[in-house]
């Protein structure tokens, strides 16, 4: 479950060059092998739904200029199954401010902020502002203080005369390979505690939805939108945190990677007082709309309580769509780097790629009005 975008600095911006990435050596151009590989690329995009999103974005990218054009082309290439050599965690973060602006315009009251690190989040807790807001920020390496690629989302409530309550949604796992993720979450918790926030009023929710290596920014953006749309349910969670409790934690914590580690440890591995839970136990079903794994979607829908069996698309659609149907509609076969960083042919839902294409389209549509 070490499938998180780690290492490197968020501040080092990558420039995607589709010409450089896709142009073969002269000796390979227009050869049968080249044509066969091109046909193979086309076959990898097997989802008609994803192809529609690709087609919707193409005309906007065609008329775009500058870095956003390169970003859009990179997203199109990835969604089409072409090989790209860039980190989308970095590309997404570079263009996140534009997406945050668009989503704040589309969703009054979202109050979404993009912070450079968790320390900016702490500063926002101590300043005048809306009583409810969401924030996306990269994690920080405890050893070097360097911001990393992996991003998370925090849903925040400020309480008059009391300490804030914070729900951090982790799109992948809390622990991670060699406990690196856990150490970074612990750094955030430590700094929150030193700033005066009781850790009994902080929860980390692990969804395990992110299986690809670098889609954390898109998951975090989607989670912020979903948290706002399900604000009443989040209000209930915040109300419990005000009293130092998180419902179902006694059973749910064991279903997280943190709980699995704690079961084999004789000491506390996360800062004492902070809460942890598995996303499917506390979050609405639409938080798993873009989950990559069909196995996970099927397992969630088999829950006895039925809380993950509902629709994940909006009421505006004529037909309801559940987790498995969504996953199958965006399922593609593509060569990806998996957790062990070895190439493998695999099938998964590229729904999160579709979300990225949609967000880029919204940014470009605003620019080209």
Swiss-Prot record:
A Gene Ontology term for the protein's cellular component: host cell cytoplasm
Catalytic machinery residues: 150, 170, 216
This protein's record includes keyword Acetylation: yes
Effect seen on changing residue 289 to E: Abolished binding to 1D-myo-inositol hexakisphosphate and ability to acetylate host TIFY9/JAZ10
Positions bound to 1D-myo-inositol hexakisphosphate: 49, 53, 106, 222, 226-229, 289-290, 314-317, 326, 358, 362
Effect of substituting residue 326 to E: Abolished binding to 1D-myo-inositol hexakisphosphate and ability to acetylate host TIFY9/JAZ10
Cofactors demanded by this protein: 1D-myo-inositol hexakisphosphate
Region feature Disordered, mapped onto this chain: 1-46
Notes on how activity is controlled: 1D-myo-inositol hexakisphosphate activates protein-acetyltransferase activity via an allosteric mechanism: 1D-myo-inositol hexakisphosphate-binding induces a conformational rearrangement that stimulates the interaction with acetyl-CoA. Acetyltransferase activity is activated by phytic acid.
Ranges annotated as biased composition (Basic and acidic residues): 19-46
Lineage top rank: taxon: Bacteria
Sites bearing N6-acetyllysine, chain numbering: 289
Keywords annotated in UniProt: Acetylation, Acyltransferase, Allosteric enzyme, Host cell membrane, Host cytoplasm, Host cytoskeleton, Host membrane, Host nucleus, Membrane, Plasmid, Secreted, Transferase, Virulence
Reactions mediated catalytically: L-threonyl-[protein] + acetyl-CoA = O-acetyl-L-threonyl-[protein] + CoA; L-seryl-[protein] + acetyl-CoA = O-acetyl-L-seryl-[protein] + CoA; L-lysyl-[protein] + acetyl-CoA = N(6)-acetyl-L-lysyl-[protein] + CoA + H(+)
Posttranslational modification: Autoacetylated at Lys-289; while autoacetylation at Lys-289 is required for virulence function to some extent, it is not essential.
Keyword match Lipid metabolism: no
Binding site for CoA: 150, 177, 211-212, 292-295, 331-334, 344-348
UniProt family annotation: Belongs to the acetyltransferase YopJ family.
Quaternary structure (record): Interacts with host plant JAZ proteins (e.g. Glycine max JAZ1 and Arabidospis thaliana TIFY10B/JAZ2, TIFY11A/JAZ5, TIFY11B/JAZ6, TIFY5A/JAZ8 and TIFY3B/JAZ12) and triggers their degradation. Binds directly to SZE1 and SZE2 at the host plasma membrane; this interaction with a complex made of, at least, SZE1, BKN2/SZE2, ZAR1 and ZED1 triggers host immunity.
The protein's name: Serine/threonine-protein acetyltransferase HopZ1a
Species this chain originates from: Pseudomonas syringae pv. syringae
């Amino acid at each position: 479950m070490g499938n998180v975008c780690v290492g490197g600095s968020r501040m080092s911006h990558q420039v995607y060059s589709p010409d450089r990435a896709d142009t073969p050596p002269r000796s390979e151009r227009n050869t049968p092998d080249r044509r066969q590989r091109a046909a193979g690329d086309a076959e990898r995009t097997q989802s008609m739904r994803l192809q529609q999103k690709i087609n919707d974005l193409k005309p906007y990218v065609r008329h775009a200029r500058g870095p956003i054009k390169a970003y859009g082309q990179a997203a199109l290439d990835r969604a089409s199954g072409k090989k790209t050599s860039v980190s989308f965690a970095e590309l997404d973060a570079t263009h996140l401010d534009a997406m945050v602006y668009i989503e704040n315009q589309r969703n009054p009251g979202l109050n979404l902020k993009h912070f450079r690190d968790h320390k900016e989040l702490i500063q926002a807790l101590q300043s005048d502002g809306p009583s409810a807001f969401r924030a996306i920020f990269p994690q920080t390496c405890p050893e070097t203080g360097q911001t990393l690629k992996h991003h998370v989302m925090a849903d925040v409530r400020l309480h008059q005369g009391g300490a804030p309550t914070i729900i951090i949604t982790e799109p992948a796992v809390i622990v991670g390979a060699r406990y690196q993720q856990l150490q970074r979450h612990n750094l955030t918790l430590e700094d929150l505690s030193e700033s005066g926030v009781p850790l009994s009023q902080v929860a980390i929710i692990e969804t395990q939805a992110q299986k690809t290596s670098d889609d954390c920014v898109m998951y975090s953006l989607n989670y912020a939108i979903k948290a706002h749309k399900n604000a009443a349910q989040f209000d209930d969670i915040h109300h419990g945190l005000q009293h130092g409790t998180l419902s179902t934690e006694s059973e749910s914590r064991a279903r997280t990677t943190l709980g699995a580690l704690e079961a084999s440890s004789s000491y506390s591995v996360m800062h004492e007082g902070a809460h942890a839970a598995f996303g499917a136990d506390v979050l609405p079903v639409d938080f798993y709309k873009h989950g990559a794994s069909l196995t996970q979607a099927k397992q969630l829908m088999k829950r006895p309580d039925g809380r993950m069996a509902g629709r994940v698309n909006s009421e505006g659609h004529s037909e309801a769509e559940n987790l498995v149907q969504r996953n199958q509609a965006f399922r593609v076969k593509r060569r990806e780097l998996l957790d062990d960083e070895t190439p493998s042919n695999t099938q998964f839902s590229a729904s999160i790629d579709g979300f990225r294409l949609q967000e880029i389209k919204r940014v470009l549509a605003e620019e080209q009005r």
